[in-house]
């Protein structure tokens, strides 16, 4: 497994076929948020050349110079695969920390 930045087309293609797909997990939503001061990050996990997890991650600079991150409607991932979920979550945390992130809000589109 490898944590990667995704191209818009490959992200949207994966997202459109995922069971937890939502408009809030599309590059179109990311572009709309960019017009309001957010930064768009399309991140994923690949197993070989196959995407097995992805997320639109948005970031915005706070008044104190650090960034808040937000994964609208959570990750597009198999939430029953704990190994994959842990791998992706840890890499998302590292990614945000490397970009001066102070927190990540995640609101997954799952029933509980």
Q: Where are each of the predicted segments found?
A:
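Short amphipathic alpha-helix that is part of the acyltransferase structural core
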Residues: 1-27
């Amino acid at each position: 497994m490898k944590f990667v930045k995704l191209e818009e087309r490959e992200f949207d293609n994966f997202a459109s076929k995922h069971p937890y797909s939502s408009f809030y997990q599309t590059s179109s939503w990311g572009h709309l948020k960019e017009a309001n001061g957010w930064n768009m990050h399309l991140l994923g996990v690949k197993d070989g050349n196959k995407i097995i997890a992805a997320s639109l991650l948005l970031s915005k600079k706070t008044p104190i110079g650090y960034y808040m991150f937000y994964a609208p409607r959570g990750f597009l991932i198999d939430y029953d695969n704990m190994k994959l979920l842990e791998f992706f979550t840890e890499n998302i945390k590292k990614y945000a920390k490397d970009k001066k992130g102070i927190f990540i809000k995640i609101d997954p589109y799952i029933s509980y």
